[in-house]
Amino acid sequence: MTETADLWPQLLGQLLERQSLSEAQAEQLMNGWLHNQVPDVVSGAILAALQAKGVSASELAGMARVLQRASLGSPLDLPLLVDTCGTGGDGAGTFNISTAVAFVVSAAGIPVVKHGNRSASGKVGSADVLEALGVNLSAEPEQVRAAVAEVGITFLFAPHWHPAMRAVIPYRRALKVRTVFNLLGPLVNPLYPNRQVIGVYAPELVPVMAEALRLLGRERAVVLHSREGLDEAGLDQPTDLGILSGGLVRTEVLNPRDYDLTPAPVQALQGGNLAENAAILAQVLQGSGAPAQRDVVALNAALALQVAGAVPDWGSGIAQAREILASGAAWDRLQKLVNFLAS
């Protein structure tokens, strides 16, 4: 007990020296949090020190591994499984772009396990908007898993799948600032997708998150941050990418002006309240909505389609995503998910 009690101040001291924790140390720390072994005052100091130093890939990977193991899920026996969950928190108030992308990718015949939550920032989260459109967030875990085979997509409402994380809620509420927990959500999908597209709220997180995905054993992934400040690829400025493929991470820049896309500022992508965001999502998935709304979904879907191996390049992905949106197939997927989880 004394040895464990001594560990937490040691980790704090290491972080205050601006030295990152190893994966093993990060695992120890997360286990300590989940089992209420770390004193509150030390926990707050550790979270602040992590944030001030800048979270590392080893810290993210170690913590995520523990949280994923502690979830109620287990790997699905599928060779290809995609998630499009981002960090959120960019403050831009866009409509639910990555949620729309999930249904486009599913309509392309790729199994999708969308992991998400309600918004923590007063905006509209993926869970909020899908619930407004009829998705049952309280479906039994077995039914949520079965939807992947039956519908081609499912939605995992994070709080139902991560009961162990209740232990850290008090720290997050008390601090009221960003912490490492804002980054862990996309890394801990309980159904273990092997391919991911993750938007992050700050450019410096792109290589860090991509390396964390490599350490966690993902096959292919793209981490992105638009220079407009979005955790999505935007239509006005280039987007910085961290691409994981073949066990290596490389950086690349995606310029929307290289493609036949509607140039549009962030303001053209903004949502509103819950009803407004639900209406935009429904319109876009049915092939209507504003051109900029459709194009930003097509662009981001292209990244996911390429990660999934469904298209050879982003241009082909944009074209396929546009066809899917125009056909209403993505809306059909949503309706099938609503009906399946309601039964």
Swiss-Prot record:
Binding, 5-phospho-alpha-D-ribose 1-diphosphate: 86, 89-90, 94, 96-99, 114-122, 126
Stored InterPro entries: Anthranilate_Pribosyl_Tfrase, Glycosyl_Trfase_fam3, Glycosyl_Trfase_fam3_N_dom, Glycosyl_Trfase_fam3_N_dom_sf, Nuc_phospho_transferase
Protein's organism: Synechococcus sp. (strain JA-3-3Ab) (Cyanobacteria bacterium Yellowstone A-Prime)
Full protein name: Anthranilate phosphoribosyltransferase
SUPFAM superfamilies: Nucleoside phosphorylase/phosphoribosyltransferase catalytic domain (SSF52418), Nucleoside phosphorylase/phosphoribosyltransferase N-terminal domain (SSF47648)
Binding site for anthranilate 1: 86, 117
UniProt record, GO biological process: L-tryptophan biosynthetic process
Subunit structure: Homodimer.
Catalytic activity reported: N-(5-phospho-beta-D-ribosyl)anthranilate + diphosphate = 5-phospho-alpha-D-ribose 1-diphosphate + anthranilate
